[in-house]
Design a protein with these regions (language model features):
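Short, surface-exposed charged micro-motifs
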Residues: 1, 47, 60, 159-161
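Short, acidic, Ser/Thr-enriched surface-loop or helix-capping motifs
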Residues: 15, 58-59, 163-164
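Short gly/ser/thr-rich secondary-structure transition/capping motifs
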Residues: 8-14, 48-56, 143
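Internal hydrophobic alpha-helix adjacent to the cofactor/substrate pocket in enzyme cavities
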Residues: 83-106, 133-134, 192-196
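Glycine-centered tight beta-turn/hairpin loop motif at sheet-sheet or coil-to-beta transitions
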Residues: 16-20
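Flexible, glycine-rich terminal cap/loop adjacent to redox cofactors
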Residues: 97, 114-124, 129-229
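FAD-site-proximal beta/loop scaffold in flavoenzymes
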Residues: 22-97, 181
Length: 229
């Protein structure tokens, strides 16, 4: 629930353990999603499969009707972000022109442009558990990174999820300064099937926030240098 408070608003909710917790803020953002603007297309008449107006496509961005493609916010099951739509558009255009192209969701970052920034790509721990994937986790706090502190960004962390046996990078999740820039390294690592060792062996310039990526990989391998394992 949301209540008035001297600060502005008070949000009362329950945590994972069922305990009642509250937060106060000047403003409350209600983010409940958006409807696809497809009503005028009369998808049913075109026999284009959809879910409440969100169009179903394959990895070529082709709909249930051969030769008809859809991209962006009207597509079902994908983040409504500009770079997502752009990547989909390139894939659709390549296939329309007779080339072979496929959209890869696992390398598509989701980003939240706030303060601090947040970004994520690949699998989460919950998804690994649901899929029966054995994994290990590495973390590194922004508070232990010099450049992050210079940018007044000591809050947050980098979290890397990797396969337990071979160390292949499965997911990366970041909260902190320049997270929406840093996440591209995670997408590259996943797309290139890089391992923790390969990320560790890559020299990251100093002082930069990118060092947190390597430090998180070191932590996953129990080889941390600037934090505890």
């Amino acid at each position: 629930s949301v209540e008035d408070s001297p600060v502005g608003a008070k949000v009362v909710c329950k945590d994972k353990s069922g305990n009642t917790v509250s937060f106060e803020a000047e403003k409350v953002l209600v983010a409940i999603g958006r409807r696809a603007n497809t009503a005028a297309l009369d998808l049913a008449a075109g026999k284009i499969h959809n879910d409440k107006g969100r169009i179903l496509v394959n990895d070529k961005m082709e709909t249930s009707v051969p030769g008809v493609y859809a991209i962006g916010d009207c597509v079902f099951g994908h983040a409504q972000l500009a770079h997502t739509a752009s990547a989909m558009g390139e894939v659709a255009a390549e296939n329309i022109c007779g080339h072979e192209a496929h959209y890869c969701e696992k390398t598509n970052p989701t980003c939240v442009y706030m303060e601090p920034e947040a970004a994520s790509v690949g699998l989460t721990e919950e998804q690994c558990k649901a899929q029966g994937i054995a994994y290990k986790v590495g973390k590194f706090p922004m508070s232990a990174n010099g450049k992050a502190l210079i940018l007044n960004g000591g809050e947050g962390l980098v979290k890397i999820i990797a396969g337990a046996e071979y160390g292949e990078i499965l997911g990366m999740h970041i909260i902190g300064p320049r997270a929406t820039d840093l996440i591209a390294e995670g997408a590259l690592a996943i797309g290139g099937e890089m391992t923790l060792d390969e990320l560790i062996d890559t020299i990251h310039s100093h002082p930069t926030v990118t060092e947190t990526m390597r430090e998180a990989a070191l932590n996953a391998e129990k080889r941390a240098i600037h934090t505890k394992n």
